[in-house]
Design a protein with these regions (language model features):
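Conserved ABC transporter NBD signature motif
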Residues: 66-74
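Conserved beta-strand-loop-alpha-helix hinge in the C-terminal portion
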Residues: 174-203
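Conserved coupling/switch loops of ABC nucleotide-binding domains, chiefly the family-specific signature
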Residues: 64-67, 177
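A short, flexible loop at the N-terminus of ABC-type nucleotide-binding domains that lies
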Residues: 1-32
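The feature captures the beta-strand-to-loop junction immediately N-terminal to the Walker
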Residues: 43-45
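Helix-to-loop junction immediately C-terminal to a conserved catalytic motif
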Residues: 58
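Conserved catalytic loops of ABC-family nucleotide-binding domains
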Residues: 139-161
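ABC ATPase NBD coupling module
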Residues: 74-88, 98-100
Length: 204
């Protein structure tokens, strides 16, 4: 049996208030696996941990506990410069965060892949002019058809954003309250009480 495309096994990330004040400030717990190619929608409030989730999958942010496995590879054991051959995080320049390396590169293993298996789109900008949206949706579908796993994270501020998620995504996650909750389809996620509170007037 082949390894899942992505598995987060008992993963948690804990941030503390500071070097001297070790009081927990934020915790995110994640546990799921995805075996088949798909386009996955991700929603959640600002500061809920969506970018932290993507950083852990891409291997730039080390989990406090647990393992992130991409196509059978433990991301924290893959050479730093080769991690984006397994999972690549597309984000805005203001989102880039630097994290210390936890072990020397010579102790790490090669990625074993020349093209990313997991593609993480963190709040992509959907330009409504000149067919750009259609181009992006076709790109996401092409990646899936090439047996890749695609995550599209949006913070909906307009009905268009929900329409795009409904059109392109086959399953969903909602990040909030320190957890990452799975939903089988668009109808299920927008019917959830927590999600409706988050969406506000867009849920009506």
């Amino acid at each position: 049996m082949s390894a899942p495309l992505l598995a987060l096994d008992g993963v948690s990330k804990l941030y503390r208030r500071g070097l001297l004040d070790r009081t927990p400030a934020f915790r995110l717990d994640v546990d799921f696996r995805i075996d088949e190619p798909a386009i996955v929608g991700v929603m959640g409030p600002n500061g809920a941990g969506k970018t932290t989730l993507f950083e852990m999958i891409a291997g730039s942010n080390t989990p406090t506990e647990g393992r992130v496995m991409v196509a059978g590879h433990d991301m924290q054991r893959v050479r730093y410069r080769e991690r984006d051959r397994l999972a690549i995080h597309y984000h805005q320049s203001y989102q880039v965060r630097r994290f210390p390396r936890t072990r020397p590169n010579f102790m790490l293993e090669p990625a074993g892949s020349s093209y990313p298996v997991v593609h993480l789109f963190d709040e992509p900008q959907f330009n409504t002019q000149d067919g750009y949206i259609g181009f992006m949706l076709d790109f996401f579908r092409r990646l899936r058809d090439e047996r890749r796993l695609v995550f599209v994270c949006l913070h909906p501020t307009a009905a268009l954003h929900l329409e795009l998620l409904n059109e392109i995504c086959e399953r969903f996650f909602f990040v909030g309250g320190g957890a990452v909750r799975p939903f089988a389809d668009f109808g299920t996620i927008v019917a959830d009480a927590d999600v409706r509170r988050y969406l506000g007037a867009l849920a009506d």
